[in-house]
Amino acid sequence: MREYRTVNLELGLPAVSEMPRRITTEVRAARGQKIKLIKFIHGYGSSGAGGKLRPAVRRELEKLKKLGLVKFYIEGERLSIFDADTRRAMDHCGELRGDADLERHNNGVTIAVL
């Protein structure tokens, strides 16, 4: 059984207003299935200055962290073996060691640790 799942939030070009419900639904479903991590793909934004989806995702994950549904999250730009949270996440879920975005500093993804 996989320890983590990838959720592409960009599919279907969703409205930012849909993100809180969608993220909460994904987190609750993953917790029920004993998934340890969720990799949210939200993109960076087509303007080159960052889009609206990325901050909306991270705001919602911060709320879920305060509610105890998410332990912590790692912004893709910090996803590195030199980052303490990334090492903690790899200890929690070994599959993260093989993730394609590790060391890519991809600010279009965020990892939620459940």
Predicted regions and their residues:
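Long, charged, low-complexity intrinsically disordered regions
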Residues: M1-L114
